[in-house]
Regions:
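Extracytoplasmic/periplasmic
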Residues: 12, 38-58
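Membrane-interface junction motifs in transport/secretion proteins
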Residues: 18-41
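Mid-to-C-terminal secondary-structure elements
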Residues: 49-198
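Alpha-helical transmembrane segments
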Residues: 2-25
Length: 198
């Protein structure tokens, strides 16, 4: 019993002292409706607007999944537009759908570029064709992190412009390696996250 207690204590200390690459303090996650209905995007927008008006809410965002739970999906067939290498289309990327406030709410820092513009997220990723990637994805695409990646294009059936590169963070757990991730802007969501004032 004593050995198990000491081991658990050390694991908790490690987790508390380790850098996740994001800030989870004072965050509250609200799961939205699991069934999509007509006009759901408008309802989501109204709910987010109501959240932002509450005095105890410092920041808020919406996403189709949340850190610790998972990604939206994984896919292959995405390559750098200029000079793709043989086999690049077989590399897998995790896809995560979120709004423009996700990175600020979770304290995820940008290495380059910026988040989505509000009207870009409202028009949805498949119409705007702008993406944000993490450092791991940038490296897997073959980009040099010391060079400017903003404005570069990737191909996923159609060309998508990279508008931001976020620093890597532990999206799932410490045990799992950080996955190459592409972030897509949208306003169709299943989760709302608020940072509350303590």
């Amino acid at each position: 019993f004593i050995i198990a207690t000491i081991t658990l204590y050390k694991q908790l200390q490690y987790m508390q002292n380790s850098n996740l690459g994001m800030n989870l303090n004072q965050l509250l996650v609200i799961q939205g409706p699991t069934v999509s209905s007509e006009g759901q995007a408008e309802k989501n927008f109204a709910f987010k607007n109501t959240l932002s008006q509450l005095a105890f809410v410092k920041k808020q965002c919406a996403s189709n999944n949340v850190p610790g739970v998972g990604y939206n999906f994984s896919t292959e067939g995405i390559t750098k537009m200029n000079n793709p290498q043989k086999g690049d289309d077989k590399k897998s990327y995790s896809m995560f759908i979120c709004d423009q406030n996700f990175f600020d709410t979770y304290g995820i820092n940008f290495a380059q570029g910026k988040t989505f513009e509000p009207n870009d997220a409202e028009r949805s990723w498949n119409n705007v064709r702008k993406v944000i990637i993490n450092e791991k994805a940038a490296q897997q695409f073959g980009f040099d992190l010391k060079q400017n990646i903003i404005g570069q294009k990737i191909t996923w059936g159609e060309p998508f412009e990279i508008i931001g590169v976020v620093k890597d963070y532990h999206h799932l757990s410490f045990r799992e390696q950080i996955k190459p991730t592409i972030y897509l802007g949208s306003v169709s969501f299943g989760y709302f996250t608020v940072q509350v004032d303590s």
